[in-house]
Curated annotation (Swiss-Prot):
TM regions (residue ranges): none
Region (Disordered): 1-21
Functional summary from the UniProt entry: D-galactose-specific lectin, binds the T-antigen structure Gal-beta1,3-GalNAc.
Molecular function via GO: carbohydrate binding
Quaternary structure and interacting proteins, as annotated: Formed of four alpha chains and four beta chains.
Record protein name field: Agglutinin beta-1 chain
Keywords of the record: Lectin
Length: 21
């Protein structure tokens, strides 16, 4: 969950963060 967005879920935030469900 960082500015890199290396997860596989919904993208959140203007930085393109992805949170895992």
């Amino acid at each position: 969950n960082g500015p890199n967005g290396k997860s596989q879920s919904i993208i959140v935030g203007p930085w393109g963060d992805r949170v895992t469900n």
